[in-house]
Amino acid sequence: MDDKRALLRHTVATVAYRGGKAVRGAPASFAGYSPDGSPRTAGKILAHVGDLLDWALSQAKGAEAWTDSPPLQWDLEVERFFGALQRFDDYLASDAPLAVSVERIFQGAVADALTHIGQLAMLRRLAGAKMKGENYSRADIAVGRVGLEQTSAKREFD
């Protein structure tokens, strides 16, 4: 595996780690939360992240396709998010060629997913379900670990 593809896999694992932190322990009611009453709720944002990951996989396979999925019930949307991460990482881990460049996948879908994970973390605080901050440079993020179960935080703070 070349260095660029390996770095993309590490980034996908980072999305899983940070995304896991953003969704873990969130109440089911968080799915419908929007600070200003707009239709862009936490559940719709997470559904969009799942769509981004599906899009990244379709780009990698050379059959680029976009889906605008309606949000599922919160726990099902969380499962969908991690399932999409797993499918994308499995493809990246394989010997299958990438139909587009690593840079294109990163600058679009993956970077956008990271942005939206940050939005979910901010919405948690606004919704009164805040999560602790963390020094992510010390986090035990490992290539291939893309499920909900992640290692415990090494250095958290309020």
Residue ranges and their predicted role:
Residues 1-2:
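N-terminal export signals and maturation junctions of secreted/periplasmic proteins
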Residues 20, 24, 86-89:
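Amphipathic, well-packed alpha-helical segments that form the structural scaffold of globular domains
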Residues 26, 94-99:
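Short, solvent-exposed, charged loop/turn and helix-capping segments
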Residues 5, 9-23, 30-68, 100-158:
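Short, contiguous alpha-helical
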Residues 55-96:
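Helix-adjacent hinge/juxtasegments
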